[in-house]
């Protein structure tokens, strides 16, 4: 009897077709002058002042978990920015949630707003994780 790991995995995840995007990226990487509009990863080194600020935060012992909503000081700054730039007022204590990236924000939004079986319009072309995210949240991509 052989061990079959997929027996123990979520069947919904196993049913989602695998994306061919990585193969595409490999081909595009061989093309001189191609501009990648892929995963949104910068093509430059993080600026020194940002790296230095991260190092200083570590040296200062700022290594504990934050609120699930994100750092209050960051949320307050986001609220100030939105007010100054767009004349929109948000309560940083109740209306702003910081995520580690757009994918996490979209995933959380889908899980909060969708009910099982809801249909969700997916624009084309779109990021490869949008449709699977809808499926994982119990919805139907349309």
Explain the meaning of each model-derived region.
Residues 7, 61, 115-117:
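Short, surface-exposed connector motifs at secondary-structure boundaries
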Residues 112-142:
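PLP-dependent aminotransferase-like
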Residues 5, 12-101, 108:
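N-terminal small-domain helix-loop-helix segment of the aminotransferase-like
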């Amino acid at each position: 009897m052989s061990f079959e790991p997929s027996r123990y995995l979520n069947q919904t995840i196993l049913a989602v077709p695998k994306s061919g995007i990585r193969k595409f990226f490999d081909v595009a990487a061989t093309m001189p002058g191609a501009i990648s509009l892929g995963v949104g990863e910068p093509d430059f080194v993080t600026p020194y002042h940002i790296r230095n600020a991260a190092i200083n935060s570590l040296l200062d012992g700022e290594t504990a978990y934050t609120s699930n909503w994100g750092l209050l000081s960051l949320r307050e700054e986001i609220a100030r920015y939105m007010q100054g730039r767009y004349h929109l007022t948000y309560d940083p204590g109740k209306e702003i949630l910081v995520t580690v990236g757009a994918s996490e924000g979209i995933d959380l939004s889908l899980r909060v707003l969708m009910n099982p079986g809801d249909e969700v319009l997916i624009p084309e072309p779109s990021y490869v994780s949008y449709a699977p995210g809808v499926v994982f949240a119990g919805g139907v991509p349309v």
